[in-house]
């Protein structure tokens, strides 16, 4: 006979058995809820205990079409002041994969235009100022997750969209990678990793985890 308490203690009950999906680039919805909330609910209804979505300065123009709030100037403020983002973070998901891009790294594009380099600042090199600003923003956001979801059992994986295309922002895979961009992206990734590690070192928490990951696709 299987003992349910033993299953829970061994973590089997929270293992991610379901092949999941992500709520990025959704094109339609059926309810009055925001795109982010509706798609998160449907992913949960599919049986998934993992939600993958994005958090970045384009929250009001890309993917979810959430209302712009000038008070939202960081990832932490996006997590606390934007109701739909807070709602999905509070949902009953065990695992979160989140593409995070710092507000401190963003150069707004002209209205109606999209430039994927606008959210990263390591093309052709990475300045110390942007590095320091990114560290603080990711450190603060990680601290927020650890404090807010302390004891929840949630696991957060903070990462990036397809990193290969950050190295080749012109989408030409036949060209050699710019060595300065490669070094810049390496510093960018290490900064994010260090910010998360330091926040975990400096905060008291239990039964909640935050990890850094790097996503690639040209493999």
Please place each PLM-identified region on the residue numbering.
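The substrate-binding groove and active-site-proximal loops of carbohydrate-active enzymes
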Residues: 23-30, 65-75, 118-136, 177-183
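Active-site-adjacent "subsite" loops/lids of carbohydrate-active enzymes
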Residues: 78-89, 96-142, 169-171
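Active-site beta-loop-alpha junctions enriched in small/polar residues
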Residues: 20-27, 56-58, 101-103, 161-163, ...
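Catalytic domains of carbohydrate-active enzymes, especially glycoside hydrolases
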Residues: 17, 28-61, 82-99
């Amino acid at each position: 006979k299987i003992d349910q308490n033993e299953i829970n203690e061994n973590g089997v009950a929270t293992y991610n058995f379901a092949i999941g999906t992500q709520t990025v680039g959704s094109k339609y919805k059926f309810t009055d809820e925001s795109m982010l909330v509706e798609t998160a609910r449907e992913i949960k209804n599919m049986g998934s205990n993992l939600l993958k979505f994005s958090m970045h300065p384009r929250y009001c123009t890309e993917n979810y079409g959430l209302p712009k709030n000038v008070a939202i100037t960081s990832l932490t403020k996006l997590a606390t002041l934007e109701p739909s983002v807070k709602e999905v973070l509070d949902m009953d998901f065990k695992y979160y994969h989140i593409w995070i891009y710092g507000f401190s790294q963003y150069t707004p594009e002209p209205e109606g235009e999209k430039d994927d380099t606008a959210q990263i600042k390591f093309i052709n090199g990475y300045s110390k100022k942007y590095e320091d600003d990114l560290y603080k923003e990711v450190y603060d956001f990680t601290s927020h997750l650890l404090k807010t979801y302390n004891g929840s059992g949630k696991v957060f994986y903070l990462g990036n969209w397809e990193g290969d295309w950050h190295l080749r922002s012109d989408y030409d895979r036949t060209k050699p990678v710019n060595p300065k961009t490669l070094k810049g992206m390496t510093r960018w990734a290490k900064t994010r990793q260090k910010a998360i590690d330091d926040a975990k070192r400096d905060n008291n928490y239990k039964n909640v985890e935050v990890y850094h990951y790097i996503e690639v696709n040209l493999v």
